[in-house]
Amino acid sequence: MPEANADSFTAIVFNDLHQRPHIFEALLKQIKDIDYDFVVFNGDCIDDPANHEQATRFASLLTEGVHGDRIPTLFIRGNHEIRNAYSIGLRKHFDYVGGKTYGAFNWGDTRIVMLDCGEDKTDDHREYSGLNDFTQLRNEQVAFLEQELSSKAFKKADKRILIHHIPLYGCDNLCKELWEPFLKKAPFNVSLNAHTHRFAHHPKGSLGNNYPVVIGGGKNPENATVMILEKKKGELRIKVLNTEGKVLLDIVE
């Protein structure tokens, strides 16, 4: 980790790869000349894990692709990581701080808050046979948000980035009713999301959002994206590229 007063970094964010190596490889080509400090996989990358071999094979491909042996690599759960026979076993492969799939940390003078939206369907949906309890997970994060947003680390940060898989804006999200009362006043510079398989940029205030929202694309060559975050002193730049290297978004917050 960098020094607490470090004011510059570059990070890469992938999402919704759905275990498609050719999509990952196409996006890697677009960032091959970038010297990045850490990487985030924002959900639905190791989707519907059936068994140990399947899950670890693709997880290894991802970490090797971004040099995870020397570059910090973060995995945020999407709704598809918590489906199928090996979904519980998948958790064992990641070092969740305090055993929680959500949390916050500082990268230099930037605060990064990660949330876990759980499933995109209610717990009583017929698919789950009464075995899911993501309502409790969402409620847990209400207390976490209340504590985090009032913390010294959050308040002192130069920039603040929110990351979670299912968008609160531009998409139905079961977390919105619980979390929005806290987030609508929180001074985040940007929220990075995924899930919809459609790249989108919702400027601050366009959907009642208190911060800009950037949603990554999907799992096919024509809609997959990779995000590049570049923090240089007081400036945070967010770029989004497609599989051909076309710049879909380039904003400074």
Give the label of every model feature segment.
Residues 17-22, 47-53, 82-85, 168-173:
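Acidic-and-aromatic substrate-binding clefts and catalytic sites of carbohydrate-active enzymes
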Residues 29-49, 189:
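Active-site metal-binding motif and surrounding structural segment of the metallo-beta-lactamase
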Residues 16, 43-44, 78-79, 165, ...:
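Active-site glycine-centered loops adjacent to acidic/histidine catalytic or metal-binding residues
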Residues 1-13, 18, 25, 29-35, ...:
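Acidic, histidine-bearing metal-coordination/catalytic regions of metal-dependent phosphoesterases
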